[in-house]
């Protein structure tokens, strides 16, 4: 267990989940994923616990199996209630439903906010006031700006990289 993503994941997970629930098999699966986990929820089952983790994809660890899902495969999410005894419903595009119904640790609402489908809003910048920035002169840039905003919100680029790549911001003095 050596990669830096694992260390960051472990620190985040230990803030939420008691150490006695962190099995060696779970920790090894997180380490082998190579991902830096940001959210975790623990669903209490009769035969053990299911662990739902997320960052760029989301993962389910159940019965010593670690399954990865792409966030693009999520059709819908529903928040029923928070912990203790929390419940969320995640519906995938293939019709499969993940339904942790006894969430005992983690922030259920934050988890589904990270997993829920995000749609590019196709912002329109054609009615901006003259002389104000950010202002787009070409409405075709709206989709690119939304894509940049999503990349920044998902943590793929920094705020500075967003500003540099945003065609609406003036670049004088850079």
From Swiss-Prot:
- Give the protein's recorded name: Protein HdcB
Give the species. Lactobacillus sp. (strain 30a)
* Key words of the record: Histidine metabolism
Biological process terms from the Gene Ontology for this record are:
L-histidine metabolic process
Please indicate which superkingdom the organism of origin belongs to. Answer: Bacteria
């Amino acid at each position: 267990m050596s990669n830096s993503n694992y260390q960051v994941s472990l620190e985040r997970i230990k803030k939420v989940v008691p150490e006695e629930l962190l099995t060696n098999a779970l920790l090894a699966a997180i380490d082998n994923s190579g991902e830096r986990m940001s959210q975790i929820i623990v669903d209490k089952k009769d035969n053990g616990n299911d662990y739902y983790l997320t960052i760029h994809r989301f993962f389910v660890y159940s019965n010593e199996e670690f399954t990865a899902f792409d966030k693009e495969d999520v059709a819908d999410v529903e928040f029923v209630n928070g912990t203790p005894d929390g419940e969320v419903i995640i519906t995938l595009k293939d019709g499969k439903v993940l339904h942790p119904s006894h969430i005992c640790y983690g922030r259920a609402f934050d988890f589904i906010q990270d997993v829920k489908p995000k749609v590019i809003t196709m912002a329109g910048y054609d009615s901006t006031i003259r002389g104000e920035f950010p202002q787009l002169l070409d409405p075709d840039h709206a989709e690119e700006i939304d894509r940049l905003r999503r990349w920044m919100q998902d943590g793929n680029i920094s705020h500075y990289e967003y500003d540099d790549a945003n065609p609406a911001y003036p670049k004088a003095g850079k």
